[in-house]
Curated annotation (Swiss-Prot):
First-level EC class: ligase
UniProt function note: Catalyzes the attachment of alanine to tRNA(Ala) in a two-step reaction: alanine is first activated by ATP to form Ala-AMP and then transferred to the acceptor end of tRNA(Ala). Also edits incorrectly charged Ser-tRNA(Ala) and Gly-tRNA(Ala) via its editing domain.
PROSITE patterns given in the database record: AA_TRNA_LIGASE_II_ALA
UniProt keyword list: Aminoacyl-tRNA synthetase, ATP-binding, Cytoplasm, Ligase, Nucleotide-binding, Protein biosynthesis, RNA-binding, tRNA-binding
Organism: Leuconostoc citreum (strain KM20)
Catalysed reactions listed for this entry: tRNA(Ala) + L-alanine + ATP = L-alanyl-tRNA(Ala) + AMP + diphosphate
Parts of the chain that traverse the membrane: none
Originating gene: alaS
The keyword Nucleotide-binding is annotated on this UniProt entry: yes
Name of the protein: Alanine--tRNA ligase
Major place of residence: cytoplasm
Keyword Protein biosynthesis appears in the UniProt entry: yes
């Protein structure tokens, strides 16, 4: 049999079908485009649905691809079975109303057996067909040289996922030989198509020839499709394992380089393909998950708490936990990204091009999880231990929620860890705790939006209402066309009138009040009667399902449906909001000018007091760039550029060069706002008339709010001036305390002070080292013996882990014992270190194993190398228990 690399296997498949007139379609983005039914592209045909449902006619009805895909429904099986993956590649050939069985079956056989192509031994290939599909069986037997005894009829060979196209299929299996047989010969599953390891399914060819109509349950009743299709799927990972004789898919060039790189970072474990062990599972999980994480982030997905971002976060945290099981400390996943890029370079060069961006995103997420990991593992271990000690089989929902809410452990990870210990998790209790938190959060919000839940009254409301706020902030003759409140039973209803003290929602036939949209908060103001008296105060304005602006008001004097009223927007507030909205456009454009192409708007909030702008960018924006951005925005303000807008169709807007917000959906007609020649964007908000109206722009803060997302908060006008003055006053206070003659002298004074502090710190470190060494001489005299090991345990008064390491260095000068265990605590933070002599290591002692055994006593966790390991915790009272556990551990060593 040929020995082929994964790249050769993939390319040979595509080349073969290209020779049969197929168009090679590149692998599409993992994030589905215009398909809300999918979280991820999860099959080879998923990106071609538009062709098979008839909504788009392909230029060439013959298509072939090798499509990356993600599935996580069987994530708990990854690493434990030979072939479960989260990211995989599906190779396929497709016919959209063109060829059918008579063509595809001989082609499949040619690709598999021809020496020019894969060249597999035909005697090792088996085929299954649907019993009623005698047509396919006949073609297999007459148009190929498949041995007659190698074809089986199987009832399951009918592809049907509900209403729509369906049909029989042929599955092709490769006989891996007796070495892979895991069942006796007489087992009912020991046949091609059965649940066994010997006969490996390598290809499925679906003959889509029937239409599953609503109400039909028997496929014999399905009518024939007028245009029959072919849909095939061949898993790259499976076929590569055949050509490389891999025991599992992981034992191939798609995974082994990742596993070998992970081995180098594990101090205690190596990968052995011939064994089924927990460590082997961890190696496989890491290799699988880093591939999925790398590709998903490369395609634009980011870790988050919901949707596909949650999938990435769960995969990453799952991989980190398996790294812990292998004794890997610190951030390690980023080091594997270049390995993935190198493996996939031939077909996915974009991974190598985006390696730095992918690594930054992973590093930020890994660091965030590692910050809480020790505490989370400690809590989880305690919870499991308590459950077992009390004879319980279930971890409470409250404990699982605390792990999720406080330590970032997704529920599924807690379930997996519990399952490993023979326990389950109270999911109902978890959901109750989650819902209770959400209820508390909603109650705590001071600005609940009345339109958060659309009621039936608003859904059915069809009365017309025009927004005139682009040119007016006051209307003298508006009619009340709807009053929405509660009836006597407290149910939402249309009312005929409103009385003082009521809180109701009003709809007018025309309104100047801007409804909250696109991050810009709503207008507020007043409703007046003909006499100019205030009858209601507008506190919020939202858009109803049918487009009307719905005004939440506090009623001052009574009014009724149909009354003519005047509407008056709070002008000062409206102007402040409009200026800040213009400032967000200036900031957006300037960020792209200064930082570059990876900046895209990720959200915004425009209030009268300040503006907030979220954008994609890896890592903090430097102080130098923040200064450039602030200066450039203020220069544009000083240039007094005109601000204009126009409504046009979306294609014309794109031709104008207008920038759209990524992920936003736009209608056929869009509004384009232009700020001179500086900026042009799709936008539906209100703005200043010229940039000079903003007066001044000041950045207040820049921070990270998630992996790959940054946030800038800023102010304009008098608020910006106040911010400058406040910072100047703070600098004056600092200058006075440093006795600086001028404000400009303060930085030099601070530098002098920093030099002095560093000098004192060095002196303090030296004194601490002397004290630690002095204490060490007494400690080293107290040597105990257990099971042939001499060991020392001691609690020292030093400043944390650095102080303990200094004592270890002194101990290593002459090794007065085989093992050294030291602890210290500052307030409630405990540091624990274990060191081993070379002789102890030769006898089989590993510091990392001991630290894992005793760290829970101090309420923490840790790990390290065989010669030295460390841990942190939050339970100083457990130090003596940890020391007592040392002798027990040594006594149990062989």
């Amino acid at each position: 049999m040929k020995e082929l690399t994964s790249s050769e296997v993939r390319q040979m498949f595509l080349d073969f079908f290209a020779s049969k007139g197929h168009e090679i379609v590149p692998s599409k983005n993992l994030i589905p485009q215009d398909d809300p039914t999918l979280l991820w592209i999860n099959s080879g045909v998923a990106t071609l649905k538009k062709y098979f449902d008839g909504s788009v006619i392909p230029k060439n009805p013959r298509i072939t691809n090798a499509q990356k895909a993600i599935r996580t429904n069987d994530i708990e099986n990854v690493g434990k079975t030979a072939r479960h993956h989260t990211l995989f590649e599906m190779m396929g050939n497709f016919s959209v109303g063109d060829y059918f069985k008579a063509e595809v079956i001989p082609w499949a056989w040619e690709l598999l057996t021809s020496p020019e192509w894969y060249g597999l031994d035909k005697d090792l290939l088996y085929v299954t067909v649907y019993p009623k599909d005698q047509e396919a069986k006949k073609i297999w037997l007459e148009k190929t040289d498949l041995p007659e005894g190698h074809i089986y009829e199987v009832e399951d060979n009918f592809w049907d996922i509900g209403e729509g196209p369906s049909g029989p299929d042929s599955e092709i299996f490769f006989d891996r030989g007796p070495a892979f047989q895991n069942l006796p010969d007489n087992d009912p599953e020991m046949y091609p198509g059965g649940e066994n390891e010997r006969y490996l399914e390598i290809w499925n060819i679906v003959f889509s020839q029937f239409n599953h109509l609503p109400g039909l349950t028997d496929n014999a009743q399905y009518p024939e499709l007028p245009h029959k299709n072919i849909d095939t799927g061949m898993g790259l990972e499976r076929l590569v394992s055949v050509f490389q004789n891999g025991r599992t898919n992981f034992d191939t060039d798609l995974f082994l380089p990742i596993i070998r790189a992970t081995e180098k970072m594990s101090p205690d474990y190596t990968y052995d393909a011939t064994k089924d062990s927990e460590s082997n599972t961890s190696f496989k999980v890491i290799a699988d998950h880093i591939r999925a994480i790398t590709f998903a982030i490369g395609d634009g997905a980011l870790p988050a708490n919901e949707g596909r971002g949650y999938v990435i976060r769960r995969l990453l945290r799952r991989a980190v936990l398996h790294g812990q099981k292998l004794g890997i400390q610190g951030e390690f996943l980023t080091k594997l990204v270049p390995i993935v890029a190198e493996i996939m370079q031939s077909y996915y060069p974009e991974i190598a091009d985006n390696t730095e961006k992918i690594q930054k995103t992973i590093a930020a997420e890994e660091k965030r999880f590692n910050a809480t990991l020790t505490g989370g593992l400690s809590l989880l271990n305690d919870v499991i231990a308590k459950a077992k000690a009390s004879g319980q089989q279930v971890i409470s929902g409250a404990d699982a929620f605390k792990l999720s809410d406080t330590y970032g452990f997704p529920l599924e990870l807690t379930q997996e860890q519990a399952a490993d210990e023979g326990l389950t998790v109270d999911v109902v209790g978890f959901n109750d705790a989650l819902q209770a938190q959400r209820t508390r959060a909603r109650a705590a919000r001071s600005n609940d939006k009345s339109m958060g839940v659309q009621n039936a009254v608003l859904t059915d409301l069809k009365v017309p209402s025009d927004y005139v706020g682009w040119s007016e902030t006051e209307v003298s003759n508006a009619a009340i066309v709807a009053i929405i409140g509660h009836d006597n039973q407290g149910v939402d209803a249309l009312l005929a009138n409103a009385e003082p003290g009521d809180s109701v929602q009003l709809v007018f036939d025309k309104t100047p009040f801007y409804a909250e949209m696109g991050g810009q908060v709503a207008d507020q103001g007043e409703v007046l009667n003909k006499q100019g008296e205030v009858v209601a105060r507008v506190t919020d304005t939202q858009s109803a399902p049918n487009g009307q602006h719905v005004h939440t008001v506090e009623v001052v004097t009574s009014f009724k449906l149909g009354d003519q009223v005047a509407l008056k927007v709070n002008l000062a507030r409206h102007v402040a909001i409009s200026k800040n909205h213009t400032a967000t456009h200036l900031l957006d454009q300037t960020l792209r000018n200064v930082i570059g192409g990876d900046v895209h708007q990720a959200g915004s909030l425009v209030e009268p007091e300040y503006l907030r702008f979220d954008f994609t960018h890896e890592g903090p924006v430097s102080e130098q760039n923040l200064e450039k951005i602030e200066t450039m925005v203020n220069q544009v303000i000083a240039n007094n550029l005109p601000i204009t807008w126009v409504e046009t169709d979306i294609e014309s807007a794109k031709k104008m060069g207008a920038v759209a917000v990524f992920g936003e959906k736009y209608g056929d007609v869009v509004r384009v706002v232009s700020i001179g020649d500086f900026n042009k964007e799709f936008d539906g908000g209100t703005h200043a008339q010229t940039t000079a109206e903003l007066g001044l722009f000041k950045i207040v803060s820049e921070s990270g709010i998630g992996a790959g997302v940054r946030r800038i908060e800023a102010v304009t006008g008098l608020a910006a001036l106040s911010q400058f003055k406040a910072e100047e006053q703070a600098l004056k206070v600092i200058a006075d305390s440093l006795k600086a003659q001028k404000l400009t002298d303060a930085p030099a004074k601070v530098e002098d002070l920093q030099v002095e502090i560093k000098t004192l710190q060095r002196h303090l470190t030296s004194v601490e080292a002397q004290l630690a060494n002095a204490a060490a001489q007494d400690v080293f005299k107290d040597v105990k013996t257990q099971n042939g090991y001499q060991y020392i345990t001691a609690q020292l008064q030093v400043s944390g882990m650095d102080g303990l390491r200094q004592v270890v260095d002194t101990w290593r000068e002459n090794y007065p014992s085989d093992v050294l265990v030291l602890a210290t605590h500052v307030d409630d933070k405990v540091s624990l270190i274990v060191a081993a002599s070379p002789e102890a290591n030769k006898k089989g002692f590993k510091a990392g194993d001991l630290i894992k055994a005793i760290a829970p006593k101090i309420g923490g966790g840790g790990g390290g190398r065989p010669d030295m390991a460390q841990a942190g915790g939050k339970n100083p009272a457990g130090i003596n228990d940890a020391f007592s556990a040392v002798s027990t551990f040594l006594d149990e060593l062989a």
